[in-house]
Amino acid sequence: APKSIAVFGSRGADFAIRESLAMGFEGPIWSVHPQREQLMGIKCLQSVTDLPHAPDAAYVAVNAESASSTVAQLNEMGAGGALLYASGFSELSDELKIVGLDRQQRLIAAAGDMPIIGPNCYGVINALDRAVLWPDQHGCQPVDKGVGIITQSGNIGLNMTMQKVGLPIAYMFTMGNQAQVDIANVIDAMLDDPRVSAIGLHIEGIPDLVAFDAAARRALSLKIPIVAIKTGRTPAAAKIALSHTSSL
């Protein structure tokens, strides 16, 4: 569970601050922006190096070209992990595909051993520990236990949080391009948390079928149900998934 959060950028980062505070996150939240004085009442630091210490979680809402530099600095200072909001990576198509792939490879290299979620990722809500790395309003409430949801669509994730009928949501993960951390990794992390009673999946693509199979078998052995919906099964749907999160 994150004990501290750093947010980078302005669009989306302000909501991450506001929603974490509204959810009841009790740890320090730092805002980093070189040109803003404050975000949501929190004084902005100028750069990563101004942080008092490495954050447990970082919400990186800077543009695609700046993302690798920010991630490299976070990795160097020992941050726990980062979530990348920006698009403009491997999901790009046609003549921009090479540009996007190059950006994504540079991002992966910059992260090193530091976990990154995304890029092209809407966000993550941890309703158990009150941490919200999310660029918008949502319907989650603090809970002591519940289900974990993993989706590659921010729109689906947002709408699911707004439902009034259903099981309480403990985690809402949107995965984006799965450049490094993938669905199997998140399933494993959820299975390590005894507060998660079931897992729901909305899948566009599975990068590592062997790891996914192992995670699913582990869930079975722990008697944690997994309910999965796989999209992109028809040629038209596969084309949409490819342009959405570069997944098949």
Describe the role of every protein-language-model region.
Residues 1-248:
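Catalytic-core regions of core metabolic enzymes
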